[in-house]
Amino acid sequence: MPQMKYEKHNARQYEQILRAARQLFVEKGIERVSFSAVADSCGIARATLYKYFPDKESLLWAIHRQALRTFGNALLARAEARPLTALERFSVYFEELARRFELDPDFLLFFDLFEKTYQAETARRGSAVYERMFRPGDFGSGDTARFICENFNDGSLRAGLDAQLTAVSATYT
């Protein structure tokens, strides 16, 4: 029983760190936020923060992974409810993006701040950074485009479009 209580505390602490760090990154910019500032914002010692994250980069990726997982799960849940045409997949993508922004405006602000790092480090699914930051089963880099590409040539979109180019253009611009 005490072990379960400790695990719940760790999970709550982890979530608190992610929320506080993301808020700081959005308010001040990634470069201007130190590990000490994150610890202070959470009311914890720096050593405690290091228990959860070995460095700032790992913390940034954890925030990103959590946000992407939340967004990806919402997309997949809507697609599992019933089969979607390619046009409906585009609609679902943009509806979920708008919904996420409405529920959590910092969601897109963090992605905007993190975009340069994200694109550089995840351009290839098999890269060392990608493998370290995304766990098997995570909604990761490129999965949004793959979501849109499914059923792409079902006739609901103009014929002759390149599926990958169209999906990437829609999701990353």
What is the meaning of each model-derived region?
Residues 1-28, 32-41, 58-61:
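Basic, helix-initiating cap at the start of DNA-binding domains
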Residues 27-30, 51, 158:
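Helix-turn-helix/winged-helix DNA-binding modules
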Residues 108, 112, 152-173:
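Hydrophobic/aromatic-rich alpha-helical bundle segments in the mid-to-C-terminal region
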